[in-house]
Amino acid sequence: MKFILNFYILIFILSCTKDENPQQIQTQGYNMLLIGNSFFRPYADHLDNLTTEANLFEHNSTVVFRGGENGRPINLWNDSITEEHQLIKSTLDQGNIEVFGMTSGYDIDSDNPTEGQSAWINYALQNNPNIIIFIAIPTFDFPNGDSNGTRPDWDTFASDNGFNSIQEFYDYYVNEMVHKEIVDELRLEFPSTKIFTIPTGWATKNLAQMNLDNELSDDISMVGPKSSSIFTDEKGHQGQIVIETGTMIWLNSIYNVDLSLFNYDTGFTTDLHAIAQDIIDSHDSNYKF
């Protein structure tokens, strides 16, 4: 009887100790290769900072950047004499890349939207047979329209394509175009390779709408300085509030970091952790890591 009593006392003490002094699980980082343009690079660069904050040891990334269409997988592949193309190949040739990330961009005039991604995955597998692939899905550009071109503002762009809102149009882009026309096809071509997506662009879409609806706790402009705006220019490049949110989406998508427990100061009063988590929760689980 005394033994049983002491046993339950011990269990009680251990359970209390666990609650009062939770042990942090330390996770090994990945060796990553990340290739893309200016709607990809800010998150790739900032991920290094957040992995440090999350105590992810030995996270390492090689980031290869080219602006605009030049940063799409197909252009990075076809422009074979460029320094960027050679850097991607030489990095993959080392045979130690665990995660390879790229954009969903492709030539809309091509009959094969997976051509660029497929070429790079084929090359990567030669020396990295267990490599994991992710495709980061960017936002649409030119939120207020292109003053030097024919692209209208987002609302008109959505309406012209038969959608009631830019959110509805973007949801179609993510789920019907990127997932079905790119990812599903790549999975058929590479059945033994893990391929998932990161819904980065929702950070821009949701924060922009929240700002229009006066739902942000910070004084944020739609267009202006990087530190205090959703967009920094007409093209729609990201302000810091978008970068912080989008990079936390990356952190969770790649490393499964619980954002509700992630003690990181974004520099904003708005609960960007919750916004990022909502986006992650809404992402189709069939396309998660």
What feature does the model see in each segment?
Residues 30-35, 39-123, 129, 282:
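Conserved SGNH/GDSL esterase-like catalytic core that processes O-acyl groups on lipids
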Residues 213-289:
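Conserved catalytic region of serine esterases and O-acyltransferases that act on ester linkages
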Residues 46, 123, 178, 182-185, ...:
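Amphipathic alpha-helical segments that form well-ordered structural scaffolds
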Residues 14-29:
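Bacterial Sec-dependent N-terminal signal peptides
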Residues 89-240:
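Alpha-helical cap/lid subdomain in secreted, periplasmic
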Residues 26, 38-42, 110-115, 173-174, ...:
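Soluble non-cytosolic domains of exported or imported proteins
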Residues 1-10:
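Sec-dependent signal peptide recognition
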